């Protein structure tokens, strides 16, 4: 995201924070507004046009959405169109991020939205049929939404369902795995957490997980949430990824390094 877009997003995030508590209805309305804007070339162009005065954009937002969404949603949308966005896609990405953060805020304490997203993403990435169904660019968004409900209703929180439904209905050219990972990162960040994806040859015990999380928290000066991936090809040890950082202590990598030394 460009610097202008990042500054605009930060400004809109402050407005979202000023709302205090946000319910799931408001979050869903924000995501729905983003889909509506993305589905109308004329509306998107008008709201992203830096030559149109903010008060005119406010009028457009109020006219289009005033009868269907609550005032908190309108306040966030007005903040979005007040900003300068580097591209149409980044404006849509900004609304989506704000919506996902709003969903995270709406979750009751202890709701495992981030881990549910991680589990869903892993399930899809290991099932070619699901990946094809969600990744089909010509697929009907409503059919994808129906599939989401069939897979997640009764198995995941309402917040997770709302987020995944958004991702499959407005992918904007992104793969489902990328979408879900990014959403999980946003949810964790909203809770003040950083995600560490830990690949292991066999599952860590609760005690090992706790020690690793504490060690990583000290290193990064932030609370760390672990997501485990079992990968038998690692042979032993583990590989940790936090953002762009990779800590690779797997036996497979050590063996490969030795092979290279003796090649």
UniProtKB/Swiss-Prot annotation:
Organism: Clavibacter sepedonicus (Clavibacter michiganensis subsp. sepedonicus)
InterPro entries per record: ATPase_OSCP/d_CS, ATPase_OSCP/dsu
Entry-linked PANTHER family: ATP SYNTHASE DELTA CHAIN
KW Cytoplasm (keyword) present: no
Molecular-function GO terms, alphabetical: proton-transporting ATP synthase activity, rotational mechanism
Family that this chain belongs to: Belongs to the ATPase delta chain family.
Gene this protein is translated from: atpH
Functional description taken from the UniProt entry: F(1)F(0) ATP synthase produces ATP from ADP in the presence of a proton or sodium gradient. F-type ATPases consist of two structural domains, F(1) containing the extramembraneous catalytic core and F(0) containing the membrane proton channel, linked together by a central stalk and a peripheral stalk. During catalysis, ATP synthesis in the catalytic domain of F(1) is coupled via a rotary mechanism of the central stalk subunits to proton translocation.
Protein name: ATP synthase subunit delta
Assembly notes: F-type ATPases have 2 components, F(1) - the catalytic core - and F(0) - the membrane proton channel. F(1) has five subunits: alpha(3), beta(3), gamma(1), delta(1), epsilon(1). F(0) has three main subunits: a(1), b(2) and c(10-14). The alpha and beta chains form an alternating ring which encloses part of the gamma chain. F(1) is attached to F(0) by a central stalk formed by the gamma and epsilon chains, while a peripheral stalk is formed by the delta and b chains.
Major subcellular site: membrane
Keywords, alphabetical: ATP synthesis, Cell membrane, CF(1), Hydrogen ion transport, Ion transport, Membrane, Transport
Annotated membrane topology: Peripheral membrane protein
Highest taxon in the source lineage: Bacteria
UniProt-annotated location(s): Cell membrane
One GO cellular component term: proton-transporting ATP synthase complex
UniProt-listed Pfam families: OSCP
């Amino acid at each position: 995201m460009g610097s202008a877009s990042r500054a605009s997003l930060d400004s809109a995030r402050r407005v979202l924070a000023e709302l205090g508590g946000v319910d799931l209805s408001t979050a869903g309305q924000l995501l729905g507004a983003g889909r509506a804007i993305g589905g109308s070339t004329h509306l998107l162009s008008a709201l992203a046009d830096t030559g149109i005065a903010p008060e005119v954009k406010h009028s457009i937002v109020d006219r289009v959405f005033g009868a269907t969404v609550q005032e908190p949603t309108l306040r966030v949308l007005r903040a979005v169109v007040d900003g300068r966005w580097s591209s149409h896609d980044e404006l849509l990405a900004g609304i989506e991020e704000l919506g996902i953060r709003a969903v995270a805020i709406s979750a009751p304490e202890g709701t495992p939205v981030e881990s549910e997203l991680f589990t869903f993403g892993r399930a899809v990435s290991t099932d070619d049929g699901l990946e094809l169904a969600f990744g089909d660019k010509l697929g009907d968004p409503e059919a994808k939404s129906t599939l989401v409900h069939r897979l997640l209703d009764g198995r995941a929180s309402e917040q997770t369902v709302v987020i995944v439904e958004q991702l499959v209905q407005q992918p904007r050219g992104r793969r489902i795995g990328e979408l879900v990972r990014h959403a999980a990162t946003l949810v964790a960040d909203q809770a003040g957490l950083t995600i560490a994806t830990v690949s292991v040859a066999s599952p860590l015990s609760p005690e090992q997980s706790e020690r690793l999380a504490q060690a990583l928290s000290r290193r990064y000066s932030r609370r760390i949430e672990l997501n485990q991936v079992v990968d038998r090809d690692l042979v032993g040890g583990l590989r940790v990824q936090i953002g762009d950082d990779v800590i690779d202590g797997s036996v497979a990598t050590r063996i490969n390094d030795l092979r290279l030394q003796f090649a």
